[in-house]
Amino acid sequence: QVEGFDAGAKAAIIASIAFGVKVVAGDVYHEGISNITASDIAIAGRLGYVVKLLGIAEQDRDTGEVAVRVHPAMVPNEHPLASVRDSYNAVFVEGDAVGSLMFFGRGAGGDPTASAVLGDLIDAAVNRDQGTHGSLGAFQRARVRQIDATSAEYLLALDVLDQPGVLHSVTGVFAEHGVSIRAAEQELSLIHISEPTRRYF
């Protein structure tokens, strides 16, 4: 749970159903919450965000490549996913025709688990009685886009000396590496950057 492997398995299943291709757990990039600190959560709160462990599945409409990843993300307070807490889970879907949809409910506990297992048993019994194997056919293996080729926004918090010119020096390092800075707040030593990366926060 903490390192996102459970969420990754769920994301692989959802991606397979959503995109009609076979995605397995090994295709999913994982980054858990064990490195998230109280300071990270406090900074996110000051900026109007909450930190959530998200499973994200995307498909490139041009290439058909699928990217599935699990990592901590800063979710705006006004986003529906920000209110998902405790034993509740949510699936947030964006589609061309339907726009944004969210499916919300309990994802843990005796009753929800028993309900899901019972539903699977009923499906299996119906399929056996009808001589079928369900409505999903055999999927072809997904073309997976690796995390190195995935671009996302993230926030970098730096502890720096409180003296003139420090922020200029920091931004100069990013400029040397071709990283654009959208916004910076020196009081909190925060820099918002956008660049393909292995780390997402």
Where are the model-predicted features located?
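Substrate-binding/catalytic subdomain of NAD(P)-dependent oxidoreductase enzymes
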Residues: 1-83, 88-90
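Generic structural signal for well-ordered, non-membrane alpha-helical segments
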Residues: 4-8, 33-37, 110, 114, ...
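Acidic active-site catalytic centers that drive phospho-/nucleotidyl reactions
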Residues: 6, 10, 120, 162, ...
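Aromatic/hydrophobic pocket-lining residues that form π-stacking "cages" and hydrophobic walls in ligand
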Residues: 40, 170, 193
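Short secondary-structure junctions
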Residues: 48-49, 175-180
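Single conserved hydrophobic/aromatic residue that forms the stacking wall/gate
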Residues: 191-201
